[in-house]
Amino acid sequence: MVDGHLEASTRGFDVNRPPSSGGGGGAEEEQDDVAGAALSSSPNNSAGSFPMDDFSGHGLGGNDAAPGGGGGDRSCSRASDEDDGGSARKKLRLSKEQSAFLEESFKEHSTLNPKQKLALAKQLNLRPRQVEVWFQNRRARTKLKQTEVDCEYLKRCCETLTEENRRLQKELAELRALKTVHPFYMHLPATTLSMCPSCERVASNSAPATASSAATSSTAAPPAAPSSGGIAATSSSSAAAAAAPDHRPSSFAALFSSPRGFPLSVAPQAQPPTSS
């Protein structure tokens, strides 16, 4: 019975329900009276305090929900600020002078400490966060370009090594082919001047025959009859011919410097007597 009264009391004090007009008001007043009688007749005061605790809990929950609602408002405001900041970042356009100055500063220092960042932002009429973001983007672009250059260099090295490997593989295949074909061929010896026995016999037999024929021709030739006036010339020429094999002139000048073996003038021959 007490549970029924408590249920009725909780339904009677529902704050979320809008107030009704007309005859409904009398029914709610009767329910309130029944709930008050139940609370006064209850032997346990804690049971009577339950709806109050419930309402206090609702109140605390409401108070807790209020800060939560405030936090939601703050989060919404923060999101709107971020949106505003994002739109401001998107709308940021640097002039040529600002870009040139930032580039020069980046060449000097790729990173900035807080003091340098503040000074640069003040000098360029920018916010420190904008300067920091610009430097971050510039470092990323530099790193990307360097990576592309390194990738291109490594690609060329890889192509060179691939070509070299292909050439070495071809040479290795040729050497293996020569090694397998080699036993079917015999190594030719080095060129020498050796002669076969038959050629040696022919050469040895032809040499004495040549010498004997030369001697026979020299003995078979009759000596020429010397003239009366040229006896001295013949003797001198024969002496020169005999000495020629032993003393040959070594040059053209020595040939003409050697003594002549013929007379400078020929002796006149005797005229035959004429008939009178």
UniProtKB/Swiss-Prot annotation:
Residues 1-92, 214-244 are annotated as: Disordered. Pfam families: HALZ (PF02183), Homeodomain (PF00046). Residues 39-48 have a biased composition (Polar residues). Its main location: nucleus. Residues 58-73 have a biased composition (Gly residues). Residues 87-146 bind DNA. Expressed in stems, leaf sheaths and blades and panicles. Keywords: DNA-binding, Homeobox, Nucleus, Transcription, Transcription regulation. It is found in: Nucleus. GO terms for cellular component: nucleus. Transmembrane segments: none annotated. One of its GO terms (molecular function) is DNA-binding transcription factor activity, RNA polymerase II-specific. Residues 145-189 are annotated as: Leucine-zipper. Belongs to the HD-ZIP homeobox family. Class II subfamily. Probable transcription factor. This is Homeobox-leucine zipper protein HOX11. It comes from Oryza sativa subsp. indica.
